[in-house]
Amino acid sequence: MSNHIFTGSGVALITPMKSDGSVNYDVLGDLVEFHVQNGTDAIIVCGTTGEAATLSEKEHCETISFVAEKTNGRIPVIAGTGSNDTSTAVMLSKSAASTGVDALLCVTPYYNKTSQQGLVRHFNVVADSVDIPIILYNVPSRTGCNIKPKTYQELCKHPNIVAAKEASGDISQVALIRSLCGDNLDIYSGNDDQTVPFMSLGALGVISVFANICPKEMHDICQLCLDNDFAEAQKLNFHYLELMLSLIHI
């Protein structure tokens, strides 16, 4: 697969709020400009860090539309549209696709303890509903559900399922996914601290929390990996490792 959604550092963008709990679009617009100007390679809106699980459907759709319009094609925008309810995931995905975003990020159904075959059916229904690329999002520590490597192998047969954000924390699983899926499925690290080892296995970058505050630094780490300078990338990774890990617990 020659066309990638992005390579490098994609920020898992926060969703700023006003004191009354509404989305602060003025600050959100400033954040988009901050990332465009400071080396971020893609913006992921309404993901876990963007509090997708606690936004209303209206807020969710409006936030995606705002970020897509504000970014205006300067860097890729990826919209989080996953849900534990297939029909809601389809609705959010169709709404996001209509705004002109470049791709969708779809988390595994949470709480339901879906079977592996259930995952295949769920994601294929979502992928059938749109005409843009989908990044699967595997974060079993939050969802209670892990996409197994052979399930990835089945899922990437769908032409719209082209990538995965792997936040399982299991480097052996990532190696097996790469072995089974090869170039049919792009991999992005879902954990900042594991970006370098994941990229040494062929991942294309990271969907990053750390990039919210250090966009250039995360971009530089990824670029060094893409340039096969893993020794220098690891030096930078070690330098920022404590900060990266602290952000997991905020």
What are the language-model segments listed below?
Residues 3-11, 17-144:
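Active-site beta->alpha loop and helix N-cap motifs at the rims of alpha/beta catalytic domains
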Residues 142-244:
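Catalytic alpha/beta core domains of metabolic enzymes, predominantly
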Residues 248-250:
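Conserved small/polar residues in nucleotide/adenosyl-binding loops
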